[in-house]
Design a protein with these regions (language model features):
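Terminal alpha-helical anchor/extension segments at protein ends
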Residues: 1-376
Length: 376
């Protein structure tokens, strides 16, 4: 996943409040339970020296009556919420933390940002497009093609073939227009995936006119449904889950290959050194909610190291100790790398041969590099 949407969180750092709270309201006395949880978090953060204004901003976000999520992750500094995320289940661990950096990794693991994609309902007169971007933004558009002739005549005679050809030409023309809008929309939001429903013939024609990458990644729903229908949304969820799983496995396979050629590293210290050099393309991380690994960091996004001495040698005057995963998240966001959580079966196998000789990357972290040091 790309983390560019988190970049504004790092415009200013220091005294960051990170709160993960169970806000499930389906149980009896839920409001009272939430209030108790938040009071405990408030006391913990106050004791750590958190800014009262920042705590007030978090309290306002958590107490929002319009927010009905089962869990919330809220990040604040200098008296303002900088980012918040709704969880569809209570957080795996309730967290109340004050640190230099926001602790975003649990949010990314439990509620990753949407995969940019398009949902399309094709008709013989055009179609409907729903676009979902990587930060959750969405929009809807309609493509209106030619309205006549779209029906084949059942009347015999010398003109029947001409009417049928005209109708088919109209369908094809409308499919081309819809395909052009789909391709343009995909480019605007960076989508590589499209889910297509609608009229059988219109779906087929649309797929013919899509670009090869979109056509090959398309998932088809064999129903005449609207682009914003529940059926298409559910189909999109299944397809995107399959695509994401396949993508991380293919990229991890590539990492194992690159490791042997100097274009891959594993372990916290080598990965952080690669970030300092601007080398990291893809970071792979074993999802471990219990991790307590730390890193030394500076003000710059790529200022992170396993030891204070390394950062001092790199020119950072006053390194500060913070969570390693918080430092990695910032480095990913600010260097245009991508984050991938490794499926459990890739890091828990007992047979090294099944995983290219590697059952688990050292420290649960590894990276594919844009270039090797030798290659410049």
């Amino acid at each position: 996943m790309e983390l560019g949407f988190l970049r504004p969180l790092y415009d200013e750092i220091g005294d960051y409040v990170s709160v993960y709270l169970d806000t499930d309201r389906v149980h009896e006395n839920a409001a009272e339970a939430i209030a108790i949880r938040w009071r405990n978090a408030w006391e913990q953060l106050s004791a750590a020296g958190a800014d009262p204004a920042s705590l007030g901003a978090v309290a306002e976000a958590i107490g929002d009556p319009d927010e009905v999520a089962a869990g919330q992750a809220v990040f604040a500094r200098a008296g303002a919420v900088t980012f918040s995320g709704a969880l569809d289940a209570p957080p795996r661990r309730e967290i109340a933390r004050l640190a230099l950096l926001p602790h975003v990794m649990p949010l990314l693991a439990q509620h990753p940002p949407p995969i940019p994609h398009l949902r399309v309902s094709a008709t013989r007169t055009g179609g409907e497009i729903v676009a979902i971007g990587g930060s959750g933004e969405g929009w809807r558009d309609w493509v209106a093609g030619r309205q006549w002739p779209v029906h084949k005549t059942s009347v015999g005679g010398w003109s029947q073939d001409r009417y049928q050809r005209s109708a088919e030409e109209t369908w094809d023309e409308n499919a081309r227009a819809l395909a052009a809008e789909v391709v343009a929309a995909a480019g605007r939001i960076g989508a590589r995936h499209v889910i297509v429903g609608g009229d059988v013939r219109a779906r087929s024609l649309l797929l013919e006119h899509l670009t090869k990458p979109l056509r090959e990644s398309a998932a088809v729903v064999d129903e005449e449904v609207s682009a914003d229908s529940q059926a298409l949304a559910e189909a999109a969820g299944r397809a995107l889950s399959q695509w994401a799983d396949r993508d991380v496995r293919e990229r991890f396979d590539d990492w194992r290959t690159q490791l042997a050629h100097g274009r891959g590293v594993q372990g916290l210290a080598p990965v952080m050194a690669a970030f300092r050099n601007g080398q990291v393309s893809d970071l792979f991380l074993a999802d471990d909610p219990t991790s307590t690994a730390t890193a030394w960091i500076g003000r710059a996004g790529n200022a992170l190291a396993a030891s204070e001495e390394e950062l001092a040698d790199w020119g950072v005057a006053e390194p500060v100790l913070d969570r390693a995963d918080a430092a990695l998240a910032r480095a990913i966001a600010q260097t245009d790398a991508e984050l991938h959580f490794l499926p459990e079966d890739l890091v828990e196998r007992g047979d090294p041969a099944a995983c290219g000789g590697i059952t688990r990357p050292r420290d649960g972290v590894c990276a594919t590099l844009r270039f090797s040091v030798e290659g410049g």
